[in-house]
Swiss-Prot record:
Organism: Populus trichocarpa (Western balsam poplar)
Short sequence motif named GDS motif, residue ranges: 141-143
GO cellular component: Golgi apparatus; Golgi membrane
Residues bearing glycans: 85, 183, 259
Pfam families: PC-Esterase (PF13839), PMR5N (PF14416)
Disulphide-bonded residues: 68-118, 89-154, 98-398, 313-394
Catalytic machinery residues: 143 (nucleophile), 393 (proton donor), 396 (proton acceptor)
Database matches in PANTHER family: PROTEIN TRICHOME BIREFRINGENCE-LIKE 9-RELATED, XYLOGLUCAN O-ACETYLTRANSFERASE 1
Record-stated family: Belongs to the PC-esterase family. TBL subfamily.
Record protein name field: Xyloglucan O-acetyltransferase 2
């Protein structure tokens, strides 16, 4: 299936000639308006920034844009092309570059999330960079955190190319980019539990170990140099694991060969988030410069069959309203995360410059079974016919794809915070 607007790219030549003069005169006031509101250049500057850049006013913010229930809405057709593609963005993980890997249908690119009560604007890369000028944003968590980070990097790269300034570890699990144009850094930290953990391996443990009363210092040790953090975990809690608290075994999840009590993973996820948010409040809450934190809620998978069979996630369009309901494990994981964010907000209410929100993307993600790589996690999987086993990724998201909407909402949360800060001044 192609774009639902497959013919919208074609214009008759005579119509084009008529439109050009009109377009020119129509653009003049728009250009002047943009220069007035957006003083920063659209393209990457070569000026070397050795110290913090002076903070200039961010774009004008409208009060009616700062309050919205983004969870209540629908996916509607959208004529506009994505801000980037596999050839214009070099940070897309190979397994999420669906078009470059031969995915034939393009329709999944032409939808936008429309909240029922308000407007969700298209992502504005310049606005994001202006609001985060002189700051360091970190994405911390599992591969969904990395997926969201790479989406954001690609959209920002459409106006200002970043420089990769740090890399450590296998599979690009720890990286940092620098936007010289705005003295702005973005990092990604691999920490699938947020708390201290030992991951299972092919040569060692056949289960994970989690130490629930200790935050993972692999990322937390850098907290003093971070201004905003986006936390994203969940899927790794489904794996077999043994849990420790106070140096004692608390229990386990799916450990039939061990003499431990089976306690599942919902309460463990809650403890991990609670420990993490408490560490943020304790270490960054008293900071006079302020600190912002967001928790991206659980993103449902869309397996409709065996992961290694053709058709594991075959959909090519979003779900319609009422077609799917957030329930079971997906709903429980989201609820735990939202509840712990609200509890941490109550515990930090006296900290004026500590801001915390849940980036609630569970429902809108549930409604996009068409947005996963599926078999196109590998290049041209059917070039030699359909094999007996076809590996599918029905968890992560194609880039570009529905996950770009997460960062549109992220920007709106930041704009809401900025508006509140201005109003208080």
């Amino acid at each position: 299936m192609g774009s639902p607007f497959k013919d919208h790219h074609t214009l008759h030549p005579s119509l084009v000639r008529k439109l050009i003069p009109w377009t020119f005169y129509a653009m003049v006031p728009l250009v002047l308006f943009r220069v007035y509101l957006y003083p920063y250049p659209l393209h990457h500057t070569t000026t070397t920034i050795l110290t913090s850049s002076p903070v200039s006013p961010p774009p004008a913010l409208l009060e009616d844009e700062t309050s919205c229930d983004y969870t209540d809405g629908n996916w509607v057709p959208d004529r506009r092309d994505p801000l980037y593609n596999g050839s214009t963005c070099g940070t897309i993980k190979e397994g999420q570059s669906c078009i470059a890997h031969g995915r034939p249908d393009m329709g999944y690119l032409y939808w936008r999330w429309k909240p029922k009560q308000c407007k969700l604007p298209r992502f504005e890369p310049n606005t994001f960079l202006q609001l985060l000028r002189n700051k360091h944003l970190a994405f911390v968590g599992d591969s969904m955190a990395r997926n969201q980070l790479e989406s954001l990097l690609c959209m920002l790269s459409s106006v200002s190319p970043p420089n990769l300034v740090y890399r450590d570890g296998e599979e690009n699990k720890f990286r940092r980019w620098y936007f010289e144009s705005h003295n702005f850094s973005i990092s990604v930290y691999w920490s699938p539990f947020l708390v201290r953990g030992v991951e299972k391996s092919n040569t060692g443990l056949n289960h994970n170990q989690l130490f629930l009363d200790h935050v993972d210092e692999r990322w937390a040790a850098d907290m003093n140099g971070i201004d905003m953090v986006v936390l994203s975990i969940g899927h790794w809690f489904l794996h077999p694991a043994v849990y420790y608290e106070g140096d004692q075994v608390l229990g386990c999840h799916y450990c039939p060969d061990l003499n431990h009590t089976e306690i599942g993973f919902y309460d463990i996820l809650r403890k991990a988030i609670k420990t993490t948010l408490k560490a943020l409040v304790d270490r960054k809450g008293p900071n006079d410069n302020g600190f912002d934190a967001l928790v991206t809620t659980f993103s449902p998978a869309h397996f409709e069959g065996d992961w290694d069979k053709l058709g594991a996630c075959p959909k090519t369009e979003p779900c319609k309203e009422g077609e799917k309901t957030l329930e079971g494990m997906d709903a429980e994981m989201r609820q735990v995360e939202v509840e712990e964010v609200e509890a941490a907000k109550m515990n930090s209410v006296q900290l004026e410059k500590f801001r915390l929100e849940a980036l609630d993307v569970s429902k809108l993600s549930l409604m996009r079974p068409d947005g996963h790589p599926g078999p196109y996690m590998h290049p041209f999987p059917f070039a030699y016919g359909v094999a007996e086993r076809v590996q599918n990724d029905c968890v992560h998201w194609c880039l570009p794809g529905p996950i770009d909407t997460w960062n549109e909402i992220l920007l709106e949360v930041i704009k809401k915070w900025e508006y509140a800060s201005r109003r208080e001044q």
